[in-house]
A protein has these predicted regions:
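Interdomain/boundary linker segments immediately adjacent to catalytic/signaling cores
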Residues: 1-46
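Catalytic cores of nucleic-acid endonucleases
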Residues: 102-163
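Conserved catalytic cores of phosphodiester-cleaving nucleases, focusing on short active-site segments
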Residues: 76-113, 117
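A short acidic/basic microdomain associated with nuclease active sites
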Residues: 41, 59-88
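Nuclease catalytic cores
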Residues: 44-48, 52, 87
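Glycine-rich, aromatic-bearing surface loops/beta-hairpins
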Residues: 145-230
């Protein structure tokens, strides 16, 4: 069902799960985060920016075109569109994706975009049919999807939602009724040899001023990396 090769999907896996540690450390320095006593509230936003920008910068080498999706003034998401296969991938932390699937009629862009998947068969037995309000919401989604996709020069035939954690990467396809149609597990593509995202910000020494040579020679402890939702 998913035409895009595992090799290309592995790029998305690496972009999401294996962040650029050097970029994280540089961002921390830029906001003055040099010791554990300092705050770094922007870290989680920055981690997403690093993921998204990796897709923007290097996605073309793997067949992807980046699609910027604005969610008001507070958040910009990046979708990865494989133009040859006409597949649009949207990535989320797994808890966030679970929330999107659990509440499909809250107007999230992932739910709106998924109406292009049409009447795919539902793999789960539904206990309740859609009520009239939910059916009306789907009609609204179809109109909203035309506006959403119409902003870009793309014509996706499939929208694939990806959820990841530190040790897993899964892709799902829902039909236009927001029912689960397909699931795929790409966890085997995770390369655990990468540096893991630090759970705590490592201690970072401030940049040294080469002009100040007559300073104390007391050795500073070396910085340690302690390890690796929308």
């Amino acid at each position: 069902m998913i035409k895009t090769s595992n090799e290309s999907i592995k790029f998305l896996v690496d972009s999401c799960i294996n962040p650029d540690i050097d970029a994280l450390k540089s961002q921390a320095v830029s906001v003055g985060k040099k010791r554990k006593e300092h705050t770094h509230n922007s870290k989680w936003f920055s981690t997403w920016d690093i993921r998204y920008n990796k897709i923007v910068d290097w996605g073309g080498e793997h067949g992807f075109e980046s699609i910027k999706i604005s969610r008001g003034n507070l958040w910009e998401a990046i979708g990865a569109y494989h133009r040859e296969n006409k597949e649009l991938f949207l990535v989320f932390k797994k808890p966030n994706l679970n929330k999107i699937i659990k509440y499909p009629f809250n107007g999230h862009y992932a739910s709106i975009a998924s109406v292009v998947n049409g009447d795919l068969p539902n793999i789960q037995t539904e206990l309740f049919e859609l009520n009239s309000t939910e059916e009306e919401r789907i009609v609204e989604y179809e109109k909203m999807n035309e506006e959403l996709i119409g902003k870009f020069d793309i014509k996706p035939e499939r929208v694939i939602l990806c959820g990841f954690s530190q040790f897993s990467f899964e892709a799902i396809i829902v039909n236009k009724w927001q029912q689960l149609a397909y699931t795929f597990d790409y966890s085997e593509l995770i390369d655990h040899s990468y540096n893991e995202e630090p759970k705590e910000q490592p201690e970072i020494d401030p940049p040294k001023d080469s002009k100040k040579k007559n300073i104390s020679k007391t050795k500073e402890p070396k910085p340690r990396i302690k390890g690796l939702k929308k």
